[in-house]
């Protein structure tokens, strides 16, 4: 599924909130953020009042992330950390078999999903994040031990997110199987 819109991936939060997820965010004009109870991410396009808009959003949260280029910030905010992230694109379904039972997570799994993701990657996953897309898990002895799902979504792309395995269950291929399953579900 190669597309001419690959450039949207340079600013994924902006385009997700401009397209598929427009009902999940705060729109300040040239700056857009997910509502804090969904995801603490924002993005911006060149324009006016970027620092002021970011200051406004900062009143709603303890911390947040700007994805993409680094904006100019006001003196009201302190930059805590800069992260370099790698972005990979899958253009076709993946032909790798899965051996473990993969379950589509529902409302009854939200607490277990939230706890597992925040055990491994604290701060990025909120209670309502799972409402942004489908999430899948592997259970062992009725305990959720590995997950992945769909977070940011725009018209042509879906982020595979929350690729998490409980530390006591790593090295068993669960993440690989879940990524394959999630990617293939996206392509259906």
Residue ranges and their predicted role:
Residues 40-45, 163-171:
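A short, internal acetyl-CoA/4′-phosphopantetheine-binding micro-motif in the GNAT/acyltransferase core
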Residues 2-7, 91-123:
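Short amphipathic alpha-helix that is part of the acyltransferase structural core
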Residues 124-166:
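A conserved beta-strand-loop-helix scaffold within acyl/acetyltransferase catalytic domains
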Residues 2-97:
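Acyl-donor-binding surface of acyltransferase catalytic domains
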Residues 73-76, 176, 188:
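Conserved active-site alpha-helix within GNAT-family acetyltransferase domains
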Residues 49-53, 165, 171-186:
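Conserved acetyl-CoA-binding loop-helix of GNAT-fold acetyltransferases
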């Amino acid at each position: 599924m190669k597309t001419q819109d690959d450039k949207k991936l340079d600013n994924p939060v902006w385009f997700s909130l401009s397209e598929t997820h427009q009902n999940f965010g705060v729109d300040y004009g040239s700056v857009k953020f997910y509502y804090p109870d969904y995801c603490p991410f924002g993005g911006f396009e060149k324009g006016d009042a970027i620092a002021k808009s970011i200051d406004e959003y900062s009143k709603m949260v303890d911390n947040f992330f700007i994805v993409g280029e680094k904006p100019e910030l006001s003196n009201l905010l302190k930059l805590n950390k800069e992260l370099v992230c790698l972005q990979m694109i899958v253009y076709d379904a993946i032909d790798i078999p899965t051996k473990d039972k993969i379950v589509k997570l529902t409302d009854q799994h939200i607490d277990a999903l939230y706890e597992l993701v925040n055990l491994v990657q604290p701060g990025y996953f909120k209670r309502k994040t799972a409402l942004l897309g489908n999430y899948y898990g592997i259970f062992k002895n009725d305990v959720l031990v590995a997950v992945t799902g769909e977070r940011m979504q725009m018209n042509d792309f879906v982020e595979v997110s929350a690729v998490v395995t409980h530390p006591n269950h790593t090295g068993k291929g669960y993440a690989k199987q879940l990524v394959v399953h999630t990617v293939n579900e996206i392509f259906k």
